[in-house]
């Protein structure tokens, strides 16, 4: 694990229409290889109520909190990684990645 600043979507739903607002957070990063061989970078950030896991490329958070960072890392099992791997290929995921990219660009200009 390494220190990492990343963006997380501000939304309770994984709906690309509502995922256009992001906030920058500081935490830790870890690149994990999926069962199909894709490498995905995850961010781990601590909030007052627990640890959260975010796909760094899209800012989409896994909708569960964990007591410790190690429990959050352990939750990235083969089943969950397979779900994330499949999601990377759908259009909604690509739309969110595009929205995050535009948000970062606009944030740097402002």
PLM region spans:
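Anionic, Ser/Thr-rich low-complexity intrinsically disordered regions
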Residues: 80, 85-101
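Short Gly/Thr-rich strand-loop-strand
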Residues: 39-41
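A short, charged, amphipathic alpha-helix used as a generic interaction element across diverse proteins
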Residues: 66-83
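Short intrinsically disordered terminal tails
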Residues: 1-2, 101-110
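A short, exposed loop/beta-hairpin motif centered on an aromatic-Gly-Thr core
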Residues: 56-70
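Negatively charged, low-complexity tracts enriched in Asp/Glu with abundant Ser/Thr
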Residues: 1-35
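Short aromatic-glycine-(Arg/Gly/Cys) micro-motifs in beta-strand/loop hairpins
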Residues: 44-60
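A short, sequence-level motif marking secondary-structure junctions
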Residues: 29-30, 46-49, 67-71
């Amino acid at each position: 694990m390494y220190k990492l600043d990343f963006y997380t979507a501000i939304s309770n739903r994984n709906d690309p229409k509502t995922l256009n607002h992001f906030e920058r957070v500081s935490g830790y990063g870890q690149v994990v290889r999926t069962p199909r061989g894709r490498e995905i970078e995850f961010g781990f950030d601590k909030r007052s109520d627990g640890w959260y896991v975010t796909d760094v490329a899209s800012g989409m958070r896994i909708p569960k909190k964990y007591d410790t960072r190690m429990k959050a890392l352990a939750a990235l099992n083969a089943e969950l990684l397979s779900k994330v791997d499949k999601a990377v290929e759908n259009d909604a995921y690509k739309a969110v990645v595009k929205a995050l990219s535009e948000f970062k660009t606009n944030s740097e200009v402002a």
